Amino acid sequence: MSVSRRWWVSSIAVLAVVGTGLAVRSERRAISADLDRARDLHGTGFVGSVACRRCHVAHYASWSHTFHRSMTAEASPASVLGDFSGATLTNDGVAARMDRDADGGYRMTFTRAGAPPRIAKVVRTVGSRRYQQYLARDGDTYWRLPVAYHVEEKRWFPMTGAFLFSDPDPDAPAELPAATPDRPVFGGGDFDRHVARWNDNCVFCHNVAPNPGRDRATGSFNTSVAELGVACEACHGPGAEHASRNADPVRRYALYAAPRADPTIVNPSRLPPTRSADLCGRCHGQRIADEVAPFLEHGDPFVPGDDLALESAPLWRDTPLHGDREAFAARFWRDGTARLTAYEYQGLLQSPCMMRGPLTCTSCHGMHEGDPRGQMRVGLTGRTENRMCTHCHAALAEPDAVAHHTHHDPAASGGSCASCHMPRIVYGVLDVHRSHRIEIPDPARAASGGRPDACTTCHVDRTVAWAETAARAFWGGDRFPASAVVAGGSSPREAILGGEPVARAVAA
């Protein structure tokens, strides 16, 4: 290469570097001004998870392995987990058959003596971990069918078996009402108890940007979602502006050096603890809208980063519904602790770790890491699970400190922070889960609240009175004064034979 040509090539390279540097510097100034504006993603469009994958390949891949991704899907060989090869289920006088039609579609046929068979075409699936539910479509309305598939045990079961209600009177005649727009009939009677309309119920928590689209005058629905399932924009907010503006590589590189977060998207890890918890609480804490009609007509206005309390309030034991303060009582123990799942957010709100500390959902759970079953952060399971607490309670990090604090072997279940402070007393999706009301275990308080206590969930051959005596011996009578509430008391073995269904499940 001649000297003159090398000079020109070198000059062009220098100019390119200088030009890029000037462009980045200019973009940094623009970003600096951009960062000063308040984030407001209301009115911003959605682009879908595939658009996010173009830049965020690793995050897309980790999300793809979660059960959030498959929360709702169109029925297809990729999404349907149930046995539709002609499997049958008989319950409450109804015979259900699950098979495929001539076109390969999925269907359920329900037959009851004295009534014609009813055929429901399965068009969508809900869930993919413990059990999978199925939706049929009738015009503009989707209905949850009365039969579900247990993924882990590979069997069909009636939806009445997934909820805690009294069994129907076996001698009562089956009710076979005519189908109406507000209530279809599949098997009829109690078999259909948990048939539910998806458009103004399940849609809110299992999809991105749900909008029931209810017409107030006709009661019909024009339901829409930005994406089926719980995808990127459910947690990060609508991404149209973010995707458009960050298509410019100069802006992307300039953002790396920016002192604050990109205002065109939400990073939950950069939100204040309460706002971060609000994001999860939108679905993991059942709530009621301040004004129900706008929610049904236009959708939930919440976007990640919002204060969840601006448009809705969490349900509590005494939350009234049409003046009835007992409407939600069965979802909680007597003392207001959640009895059923989907109230984890309420548990956090009752926890001193959140009320007086920095605890939030992502302190323990990682949406892009860990086992999809629970999505615990790496390093917070098994023998190292106590780290979820000792990052604040550092004095209890060493085994000797754990043994002194718990009076248990630190390597055994009694040395686990969660065993005592988050006992498994919550029922849902066919399993018993940890309470998210993080508190000091107190047998007397648990007994007065009508719920199982942490001690006897492990010491199943002991009574609550024994647990109270042990607590006073270990930690002092000042903290645990004697209580007449637990005099005598019962054991979990006796609870198995009792009438409280969640207590039976906990004891089992």
Over which residues does each language-model region extend?
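Membrane-interface motif at the C-terminal end of an N-terminal transmembrane signal
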Residues: 20-32
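Hydrophobic membrane-insertion alpha-helices, especially the h-region
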Residues: 10-22
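Short, Lys/Arg-rich N-terminal segment immediately upstream of the first membrane anchor
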Residues: 1-5
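Local sequence-structure signature of Cys/Sec-based thiol-disulfide redox active-site neighborhoods
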Residues: 42-57
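Surface-exposed intrinsically disordered loops and tails
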Residues: 176-182
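Conserved catalytic alpha/beta cores of large enzymes that bind or transform nucleotide phosphates
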Residues: 199-213
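Primarily the internal scaffold of c-type cytochrome electron-transfer domains
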Residues: 29, 33-36, 50, 58-127, ...
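Long, basic N-terminal domains or extensions that often function
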Residues: 171, 187, 201-205
